[in-house]
Amino acid sequence: MTKKLTSRLSKIANSKILIFSIYINIVACIIAALSLLYYWYRVINKNLSLWLMLLLLVIAGLAMYSIFINIKLMATAIEEILTENIDLEKYLDIYTLMYKKANRYSKEEQEASLIFTDGRVKYYRGQFQDVQLTFDALDYNKVQKKYRTKLLLRRYNFEMLSCILQKEREEYNRLKSEIETLSPSLPSDQELRDNILKITSVAYSIIVEKQPNNYFDDHSVNSRLGKITYTYYAALNAQLKGEEARTRELFESIAQENPELFYVREAKRYLKGEQ
């Protein structure tokens, strides 16, 4: 049910997504505030049963919890604009809209999110030379401490992949050395770093060293964008192994996707050249 809801939300206009999120939060805050105010008023008047007291507290708690769920729901819906709908323009636009509408307390953090999103979109569009320049504008002091490490790791991921696709060995090795020295405190961040190192290492092997590696054939991901990514690298791997029929089959499977993705343009270029 949650998956269907986030999928539907990701397909509506960006302004409506934000309005829906704000509306839900406002309603939940009002319910929580009224419940707590009534609870306080009746306690002062000493005319409230224990069960009613508990009920009001539960209502207030559920209202506050719904705000938390709504935030997570909106974050998932926004991410699906990119990973499932493959709508790069809309994805960048909603972060631009959130930045413009942010209040003075969240303006700086929304600016950092917008810069990172811009760099991410440029990567998927194949604008590899602009990726690092965009990320260089990031000010990590504007990001909440608990998110800084994850954001830094994800930046390394896109920068390293950009270097690989441009065959910039020296810069790739420099970035790899830097990320290897990081010691994330959270297990989830450690797992993310290890996964980035693994995937970039395999991509480097296939694209730069021209050495076949079956990682992308043997592993899978759930998102539509992730599947396109893995299929692209699996096709390059098949090409290295001289498996032209499989290479063609894999490239054909992604050639009808959004041509904004460099994966798709490269697939079409291969298929056109083959003809």
Name the predicted role of every residue range.
Residues F68, K72, Y105-E111, K146-L153, ...:
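Residue signature of alpha-solenoid helical repeat architecture, marking inter-repeat boundaries
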Residues I81-I86, Y123, I164-K167, S205-I207, ...:
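Hydrophobic/aromatic side-chain positions at a characteristic register within alpha-helices
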Residues K90-K100, F128-Y140, K167-P184, V208-S223, ...:
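Alpha-helical repeat scaffolds
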Residues A60-V143:
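N-terminal topogenic membrane-targeting module
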Residues Q132-K142, K146-R169:
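A membrane-cytosol interface segment of integral membrane proteins
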Residues T76-A77, Q110-R120, L151-L161, L192-Y204, ...:
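"A position-specific structural signal for the A-helix of alpha-solenoid helical repeats
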Residues M1-L92, M98:
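N-terminal alpha-helical membrane-insertion module
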Residues N213-Q275:
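Long, non-transmembrane cytosolic or organellar matrix-exposed soluble domains/tails
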